[in-house]
Amino acid sequence: MEYEQNLILDINPQTGLTTNSKNVIKLRLLRNSQFAKWLSECSESLKNWIISNNLEPKPGSILRVPDKDMRIIEVIAIIGNENNFWDISRINKQLSSGNYQIEFIYNDKNESKNNLAIAWALENYLFSPFNAGLNKSEKKAGLSKLVLKRSEIKSIAPLLNGIFLTRDLINSPANIVKPSILEELCKKLAKLHNAKFKVIKDNNLEINFPLIHTVGRAAEDKPRLIEISYIKNKSFPNITVIGKGVTFDSGGLDLKPPKAMELMKKDMGGAAIAIGPVSYTHLTLPTKRIV
């Protein structure tokens, strides 16, 4: 299944984050409030290039700057003064393939490089296991890639892999992601993180968790309660995360219109969130135990 590529703790190629610093194109970020000052300080030739290309101080706007041989050597990109997380996603969407390195035209100590990298990576997410016409190798080759230090990528890789995993699970149809598939996935996650794994089903489920049993007992793929338990430092508090994993809801007597029924695959979103990002927080959160 597609989600297998996210069962890693290291760099996921799908994120578009790389340590390859060859042929780097500078991605120079400028806040819209700084635009007038910056424009007044530009050389005459750059100022003419800016004006002729109608670069405006709107978040998400970009300007490609070539050298004398018309090769792109830098990109000027405008971000907002506040809440600019998704500005980076919009900027990434407009870039051609290549390796980019972020720098601020004016030093900005308050901006988190991690947040910029996360926004960049989320824009590169693609769910395509059922799209036969899409060449995934071409898609990966065509990614605009953000150059970071390996330590910087590793610090956010678990979170991004968890988010991608959650998205894949929610996007997958109910005939693919069934209770047994969720169990298989959780078992692999537990092994990956050296965590305890437990499943309650059949008679044990009926006796101890009758409501879960009642909801899913008529299904061909039987209901179950899945538990992954991470134990870290005993001096830290316990955290328990519970996610509903109804992989398909018929809507009672199937009274929902067809379009609404298509979205019922998302009824297991709670479990997907518990499995995805939450399953990776144990790497960084100061907790004794996460269940």
Q: What are the roles of these predicted feature ranges?
A:
Residues 1-247:
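N-terminal hydrophobic/helix-forming segments and targeting peptides
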Residues 91, 273-280:
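Buried hydrophobic packing segments
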Residues 166-172, 256-263:
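Active-site-proximal beta-alpha loop/turn segments in soluble metabolic enzymes
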Residues 238, 242, 258-266:
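Short pre-catalytic strand/loop immediately N-terminal to key active-site residues, enriched for Gly-Thr
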Residues 248-256:
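Short acidic/His/Gly/Ser-rich catalytic and metal-binding motifs that mark active-site loops
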Residues 266-273:
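Alpha-helical transmembrane segments that form the membrane-embedded catalytic/substrate-binding core
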Residues 281-287:
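Conserved small/polar residues in nucleotide/adenosyl-binding loops
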